[in-house]
Regions:
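A short beta-turn/loop motif at secondary-structure boundaries
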Residues: 2-3, 109-111
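A short glycine-rich, His/Asp/Glu-containing loop-to-beta-strand
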Residues: 3-11
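Catalytic core of non-heme Fe(II) oxygenases with the double-stranded beta-helix
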Residues: 10-95, 105, 112, 127
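Short, charged beta-turn/beta-strand-edge "cap" motif at the junction between a beta-strand
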Residues: 99-103
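A short alpha/beta connector and helix-capping loop motif
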Residues: 110-121
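Double-stranded beta-helix
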Residues: 119-133
Length: 133
């Protein structure tokens, strides 16, 4: 029998230019709930700081998972999946394996804060009734 344990949780309040660098967590699963997203991705990518870059390389305000990879010839690369966030994501929970590397990019178009609730979940394994104590 397994018991689900909310190991930790916290609120993130991020303002313009703030970000979370690439990281992962030590639990089994993690989650993020977007409570407030004060910007629109389509507005963010038009910011003048991105002139001269490909639209696909512009990631302001985004949440991204990535993992290194290599092919049979030893060529190294990175696979990624990017969530282009806007107000429509408010109230959405994303649940993922904690060891999956992820990052949060800064936003630029507003002085309002982005608010998320994040946490880590573990399992406790009970082999018999005496282990529950």
């Amino acid at each position: 029998l397994k018991k689900v344990k909310l190991e930790s949780f916290w609120a993130n309040h991020q303002y313009k230019y703030e970000f979370n660098p690439p990281h992962n967590h030590s639990a089994v699963y993690s989650f993020v709930i977007w409570l407030k997203i004060p910007y629109n991705y389509k507005t963010e990518i038009l910011d003048k700081r991105f002139s001269g870059t490909k639209v696909i390389d512009r990631k302001p305000g985004c949440f991204e998972f990535y993992t290194p990879n290599s092919d049979t010839l030893g060529n190294f690369g990175i696979d990624s999946y990017t969530y282009q966030l806007d107000k429509s994501w408010e109230g959405t929970m994303l649940f993922f394996p904690s060891n999956l590397t992820h990052q949060v990019f800064p936003f630029y178009s507003t002085d309002e804060k982005r608010i998320t609730l994040s946490g880590n979940i573990n399992f406790e394994l009970f082999l018999n009734d005496t282990d529950k104590k």
